[in-house]
Amino acid sequence: MLTWLHTDVTAKTLVVYYSYTGNCREIVTTLTSQMEADVLEIQPAEKGLKYEANNYALGTQLLNAIKANPNDAGSYPAIDPVATSLNDYETIIIVTPLWWSLMAANMQTYLFNYGSQMAGKNVGLIVSSASSGISGVVDDCKRLVPEGKYFSENLWINHSNHSNRATLIQEWLTAIDYNTVTGISETKTTATAPTRIYDLGGRLMAEEPSKGIYIKNGKKVIR
């Protein structure tokens, strides 16, 4: 017996990330090996900056400017223009470094500019840090994306467990019930070949699988 479920391919996931040291980029690579998603990398407009130089002087300066006037667009560092429309996505996963107990300034810029467009969307947060806890980053995210539908748990990956990120990500996706929240769930049929494909509304879509996301024998299949 075949078990198939067809979902609306427009209900997609976007992973938005900023990476300074490369750790968040590695996290995103691992994450997207376990799920289907588009990826958007946030880049600072001014290249080659050393945020950690002179005892983290520049990074601290950027964060202090945001803290002083968090509602002023001029407080946030410039980032490269972003062409990706959030209208195409139902789920946004934010992957960001922690800077001095707060969200990295460049990611704060992106969320200041686009966080209001995430209202009503599923929002997940993955934070990379050396060792510090992530409560300040969570607070920044909820300030900048106040109307997001946050998953039940955030994921913290630090220096000591970064090498184990594949397992941590897999456990997190299970804990937040990602497949169910995003419309991927199992359904069974006793129908014989040819296999009929139905959408979530019960409408017949095709006699054979076409492009989309399916569940085959309890496993997600991308065609």
Per-range role (PLM):
Residues 150-181:
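Glycine-rich phosphate/pyrophosphate-binding loop and the adjoining helix
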Residues 20-23, 44-48, 98-102, 129-133, ...:
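Solvent-exposed loop/turn segments at secondary-structure junctions
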Residues 179-201:
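Residue-level detector of functionally pivotal "anchor" positions at catalytic/ligand-binding pockets or at interdomain
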Residues 213-223:
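C-terminal tail/sorting-segment detector
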Residues 33, 86-87, 112-120, 132, ...:
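Short, conserved loop/helix-junction motifs that constitute active-site signature segments
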Residues 121, 210-213:
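A glycine-anchored, Pro-Gly-centered beta-turn/N-cap motif
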Residues 124-157:
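Short, glycine-/small-residue-rich phosphate/pyrophosphate-handling segment
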Residues 6-94, 103, 170, 174:
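N-terminal beta1-alpha1-beta2 submodule of the flavodoxin-like/Rossmannoid cofactor-binding fold
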